[in-house]
Structures are given as structure tokens and as C-alpha cells.
Amino acid sequence: MSAGYRSMAISASDRERGQQSMAMLVLAALGVVYGDLGTSPLYALQEAFNGDHGVRPTPDNVVGVVSLFLWSLILMVSVKYVMVLMRADNKGEGGILALLAQITGGRSGDGRRVAVGWVLLGLAGAAMLYGDGVITPAVSVLSAMEGLQVATPALAAYVVPATVVILAMLFMIQPFGSGRVGAAFGPILAAWFVAIAALGLAQLWRNPAILQAVNPWHGIAYFQRNGFAGFVSLGAVVLCLTGAEALYADMGHFGARPIRLAWYGLALPALILSYLGQGALLLAHPQLSGRPFYSMVPEWGLLPMVALSTLATIVASQALITAVFSLTHQSAQLGFFPRVKVLHTSGSHKGQIYLPLLNWTLMLATIAVVLGFRESGKLAAAFGLAVSTTMAITTVLFAVLARRRWHWPWWAVALVAGSLFAIDLAFWLANALKFLDGGWLPLLLGLAVFCVMGCWFGGRRLQMRESRGRQLPLEALLSSLGMNPVARIPGVGVFLSERADGTPLVLLHHLKHNQALHETAILLTLQMLDVPRAAGERVSAQWLGQGMARVTARYGYMEEPDVPEAMARAAEALGLPPLEPLSTSYYLGRQTLVAAPGSGGLKRWLVGVFAFLRQNERSATLYFGLPPNRVVELGARIEL
């Protein structure tokens, strides 16, 4: 075979492999990302016509509500998330913290107070996603299992126990990773989308009058007709958007293109047909508004559809679990959350992670919610407030990013972000009226997480400020060692430092107590960047004199620091022989934190919470991959 033909064959083979890889990513993204959005037809539309705030299912109201559902999907998912926000990625990573990292990482001249304000706003939005991550698995699986009551009322007593068992099994398979889970769940959700599209299309064929809902004027007329009651029903409309924030947060797991292809190719058309089909059914049979989804299913297919919907809602839960894992990992790397154990579950896609402690915490909280509420209708009223809060904060942060980093003109920011925020605000106000109906639950969960993140962020700021005040200039230390030499012991001592300037406090304590220093002393700083993965030089090293060297290792917030690997690179850069494990010691500071005398009650509480979190976070030895038998921890008492 000639070189030209061989090159063409290799190129065609590469293209085929690339297409197969993309198809697998699209299928995995379909299974993990779109489960929550995809199963909303189970309960979303019926909430608009039932409960304390439901409207009568008259033909005009049915057309108006369905129009609101369709245009909410188009404006808030297709436009806001898929077209706009997915372009606001941070080197491939999405989510509210990716927005926050871009805003705070590029600030210049805004002042510390403004930066802290954006951080707290971003943390509040991120915290709401935890409440959503607890409630979504509960309401999704519970709503599917309640379909058993439609098929066989005698099974009603088994709905809650079966839901608990299914949720427990879902969390138990998380260690296998989102990629493997997505590969298994993708075909299930593909079948689900095809099924709901077929059911909707059958009803649409019988009653095409519902196609009027495609005209957005019917949604506007719905508000004019129903007034305040119509506005309140937006609390039900927002249920069709649950999972949109996870779509953005999961960008790092699968990439933007597979997520877009899955949305436009299957998810969006199927959702539109499903809501149109339910609307067509209600035009002919308004008395079925209590359960329009299952009413579309012929009697012979009811049990198979209940089984498929149960599988699909298991998939739906995965979207939020994956997003919460990603969010927690980003938070810890950016300094907004204590260190936790992170396991990477894929060698080819580094964004696929598993957090054991968080997984079991979510499982217990989700099961507790199921046992407490016991009905999906009660839970459906609960989590719209968390969803709309996160969506609104995301829009605000996007506006700041567009203005400060992308340098959009004010009129463009007002046109794009202002229009989206107006819709977000309407959803939020409508859901705020459901606070006493269960909306308090996600807010309570979000507030608990926000307290942890806020206290950690505030405590770290106090600690860094105190450390700067106690730090000795490095030049002074080098001068002191030159005039007053200390005993030198064989080997290498590595002293970890949070700052790349000054002298690490752990080194000062070592000199104070031991009156000796290793022949080679390395001051190591692990620098966490505000991008997902570090580009360019990973490790920089330079000699300082007196047998001391400064080493800085740079990592993105989606990477795991590996100190031994960084030190191997540093030794090569410094011209040192490979470091011998038995002659290298790592020195870490272990600080006891207390509030300074005279501190107010709020500061004492903040320092107390921060000290508790610091005491119980994952140890630096395990987190940085240090050999446990070569680590020395030196304690100190610090008043903040």
C-alpha cells in the first residue's frame, strides 16, 4: 500500500474511532446529565393544576400552561444554559464555582470588600445545589414508584420501602464512577426519551389543537386571564427546569459538545412532545389532571411504563449526585471547603470522581427526606425554591463575568443577563410563596452547607492574615543562618508553606525546638490556580542560599496535588540526586486555633466552627500523597 493510501486509511480509521468515542460520550452524557430534566414530565405539569396553588384545567389554561413549559425549556435551558452559560466555561469546567473562579481570579482594583461579596454570593448559590441534590433523588424515585398505585392500588403500602431500597442501591454503585454508570444508564434514558416522545406524539395526533401552545402569546394571555393565581403557578413551571444547573456543572465530566448533541438531538424534542401530549390529553379529558402522564399510557403498557420510569428516575438522581461531587471537589481546591477524600474513577476523563464521605451523607439525608415526606407531591413543592435561587445567582455571576472579564458593553449585559434574570426572579418569587409548603427544607439544607463554606472561607482569611503578621522575611532568616549557623543533619527536609514568600511557620518552630536544620531544606508551596488544570511549567525551583531552596508546584482546582512527584521534578531542576525516601522528611504545621481575647460572639462562633472543621478535614499527609512514616507534624497555638 502506498504512503498516500495508507495515510488516508489511517485518517479514516481515526475519524471512525473519534466518532465512536463521541457517540459513547453523548450516550453517557444523556444518562448522567439529562436524567433530572428528562423525568420532570412525571410530576411537573400535574402540579400546575393540583395542590393549594393549582388552576382549573380549562382549555385556555391548559394551552397557556403548556406554552409556559415549552418556552421555559427553550429560553432557560436552550438559550441560557446550552447557548450562553456553556460558553462561560473555565478551561472546560462549568458550574457556579467555575464562574466564581473566573470573576475573583481576574479582579484588579475592585477592592477586597467587593471580591468577598461575590464569593459569598457564589457560595450561597452553590450551597443551594446541595439541597437540590438531596431532594431530587427522593422526589424522582418516589414519583415513579407511586405509579404502582395506578396499576395496582394494593401495592400502595410498598411505595416508600421500595423507594428507600432503590435509593440505597443507587448510592452503593457510585464507587464505579459516573462514566461507567453513565454507560449503563445512557441506553435506559434513551429508551425513556423515545417512550415519552411516542406517548406524547400519539396524544398530539388525536388532538392537534394543543399545537397552539407553540405560540408564546398564549402564555402571556394565561397571566392576563388568571392574574395572581397564574403568577403563582410559575412555581410548578420551574419544575420542568430542575437539572438545568447540573447540566452546566457536569461540563467537566463529558465536555460541551456531547452535552449539546444529546440535548438538541433527543432530550429537547422528547420533552416538547411529552408536554404537548399531556396538554392534548387534558384538552379532551380535563378530569385526568391529577396524573396526566400515566393517563397517556394504554392499560396494557402501564406496568412496563412504571418499570421504565423507575429506572429513568434512578438515572435522574445521578445527575445531581455527579454535580454535587464535582462541586465539592472544586470547592475544596479553591479553598471554600475542607479537604475531603477524592477518588478518580476514570483514567481517560479526570473529571469523573467519587467522594465517599459525601456519597454516604447524601444517601442518609435523601432516605430521611423520603421517610419524612412520604409523598412526591409534598416534595415537588419543596425544591423549586432551591432551583430558582441557584438559577438567579448564576445569572448575576454571569453578568459580572461578562462585564468584568469579557468587557461586554452595559447595554449587552442588560439585554442578555437582565432578560434572563427577570425570568429567574419571577420563578423565585412564585416559589417563595411555597416556603411553608416544604420550601424551607432545601433552604435549611443550603443554609447548613453555606455556614460550612462561609466559616471555612472566613476562617482561612483570618488564618492567612495572622500568618502574614507572624511571618519572618526570608532574607532575615538567611542572614541569621549566615551569622549564627545551626547544626546541619544529613538528608532533605521539606517544609510545606501556604505562601510562596516569607518563611514557613513550621520551619521557624522546627529551628526553635530542634536547633538544627537538614543539609538541604526545601520550602514547598502548593499553588492552587483558578483554572481546572495547570498549563505550562508545573514545578519551579530555585536555590536561596544556606542550603535552602524554594519550590512552587502549581495545580488546577480539578487536579490532585502529588508532593512526591513534584519533589522528584524539583530535585532534577535543582541538580540534586533523586530523593531517597528514607532520608527525606516532610514537615507540616498542625495549628490549634482559638479566638483572640476580646473577640465578639460572632467571631468566636466563626473561629470555633473553623477550628472544628480544620481538626476533622482529611489529613494533609493523605491528601498530598506523603509517605506517612516520613511526616513530622509540629503544633502551635494561634489566636485569630
Swiss-Prot record:
GO MF annotation terms: potassium ion transmembrane transporter activity; symporter activity
Transmembrane segments: 25-45, 65-85, 115-135, 153-173, 181-201, 227-247, 263-283, 305-325, 353-373, 381-401, 410-430, 438-458
Membrane-related topology note: Multi-pass membrane protein
One GO cellular component term noted in the UniProt record for this chain: plasma membrane
Highest taxon listed in the record's lineage: Bacteria
Signal sequence segment: none
Presence of the UniProt keyword Ribosomal protein in the record: no
Reactions this protein catalyses: K(+)(in) + H(+)(in) = K(+)(out) + H(+)(out)
Subcellular location: Cell inner membrane
Function of the molecule: Transport of potassium into the cell. Likely operates as a K(+):H(+) symporter.
Protein's recorded name: Probable potassium transport system protein Kup 1
Organism: Chromobacterium violaceum (strain ATCC 12472 / DSM 30191 / JCM 1249 / CCUG 213 / NBRC 12614 / NCIMB 9131 / NCTC 9757 / MK)
